[in-house]
Amino acid sequence: MNAAGGGSGSQAAGAAGVNSSLSHNALLSTASGATTMPMAQLADGWLELESDPGLFTLLLKDFGCHDVQVEEVYDLQKPIESPYGFIFLFRWIEERRARRKIVETTAEIFVKDEEAISSIFFAQQVVPNSCATHALLSVLLNCNENNLQLGDTLSRLKAHTKGMSPENKGLAIGNTPELACAHNSHAMPQARRRLERTGAGVSSCRFTGEAFHFVSFVPINGQLFELDGLKPYPMNHGGWEDSEDWTDKFRRVMAERLGIATGEQDIRFNLMAVVPDRRIAITHKLKMLRTNQAIVSGTLQKLLKADEQGESGNGDSQRPDTPTTLLEPSAFTARDLQSLLKNLDTEIAINEQHLADENDRRHMFKVDASRRTHNYDKFICTFLSMLAHQGVLGELVSQHLLPSKKVSGQGAANRISKQSTTASAGGSTTGATASTPKTQQQQAAAAKNGKSPSKTPGRRRKGRNKCRKRK
């Protein structure tokens, strides 16, 4: 915590090193000139983001990295295809409570060598509420550029921060307008109001015990690194066996972290994987399947045509030349090719459905983002004012309050009915004795003679029996 919460003096010095040519009140603009933001709002104006894979996927696209998506991991044992890294979200107060248990372990795996630290992208979180962007950049900027297209913004950031200290890298992230604007564009309106109420400089992601925090797990040079912007150094969890994948090592680390091995599952967490865009692999597979479909279909047509010519008596007809070495006419009959073509059609239909599902997911990501970021305050206030102007607001409020009153009235009625039921049940014991035929005859005779019926005939009867016994 002390390393993450750097003082204002070190922050000013780092900011001077990163943006020495810009004044504090200057306007920063992107390379295209479309995005402008006051310098004073960059480091202090970052907003909280939700932990949502759709939000993170759209955020990566806004960063300029288009061939990547983020998926939520529900089962650690389920294999994940070609992940770039993992983002682990946990409750910061719970990590702080468990600090005594893991402080010795983390101290042993800290990488304190400056040369080793400068060779990787590790940035300390010195800007409030930027942990989500930090986690994404810790994965992307430590990946091989041959396997991932970072885009102009991230490529410039990676080149600009090469050789910087972790603190200055964190300041460089916070003072990049493209990242700040993309980050804040996915925040809910409530996050902006909270920031305005509490004032800048206080990070709920860093200091509030009820907040959550993001950290990244990424393979670097055959070692599994944990990159936490609130820690002073990166953590090296070591390598993995030659017969293993790096995700196997990650599963063991997470199992120990979450207490799954010991049964202590008391940490609320969320796990997401940064993976290649699934649509790219599906599109490539569809292209291959359609190519094979065309080859098989063409070969089948030529084979059937040759068989028809042979049946018609044309002895000079030859077997067709295949367009590929994968299919030899002597190895496949017409029935085999028809069966293979049917399987290809099925595979194509399945992958087309998968591609449509992925596109629908992307569309829903955008719909959810619009709903998440839209400010409904003006609409609600205008709608209520129109109802009040038409004179129907009070009636609607009364109608909505009536069910609660009915419920309370029903509760009182139920209590009264219970009391009456209890009273009638208590009197039913005495009434049962008085309602017997013999007792009714006695009451009728007493009424005829002008005498009041006895209230306790049972007791008098017992007394007479005792007197008779004494005699």
Swiss-Prot record:
Catalytic reaction(s) noted: Thiol-dependent hydrolysis of ester, thioester, amide, peptide and isopeptide bonds formed by the C-terminal Gly of ubiquitin (a 76-residue protein attached to proteins as an intracellular targeting signal)
Compositional bias segments (type: Basic residues): 457-471
Active site per the UniProt annotation: C131 (nucleophile), H213 (proton donor)
Residues at the site labelled Important for enzyme activity: D228
Domain ULD: 375-403
EC assignment: 3.4.19.12
Entry keyword Nucleus: yes
Gene3D superfamilies hit by this protein: 1.20.58.860, Peptidase C12, ubiquitin carboxyl-terminal hydrolase (3.40.532.10)
Protein localization: Nucleus
UniProt biased composition (Low complexity): 420-447
GO terms classed as biological process: epigenetic regulation of gene expression; heterochromatin formation; protein deubiquitination; specification of segmental identity, abdomen; ubiquitin-dependent protein catabolic process
Chain positions covered by the region annotation Positively charged C-terminal tail required for binding nucleosomes: 405-471
GO cellular component, one term: PR-DUB complex
MF terms (GO), sorted A to Z: chromatin binding; cysteine-type deubiquitinase activity
Subunit structure: Catalytic component of the polycomb repressive deubiquitinase (PR-DUB) complex, at least composed of caly/calypso, Asx and sba (MBD5/6 homolog). The PR-DUB complex associates with nucleosomes to mediate deubiquitination of histone H2AK118ub1 substrates; the association requires the positively charged C-terminal tail of caly, probably due to direct binding of DNA. Interacts (via ULD domain) with Asx (via DEUBAD domain); the interaction produces a stable heterodimer with a composite binding site for ubiquitin.
Protein name, as recorded: Ubiquitin carboxyl-terminal hydrolase calypso
Organism: Drosophila yakuba (Fruit fly)
Gene responsible for this protein: caly
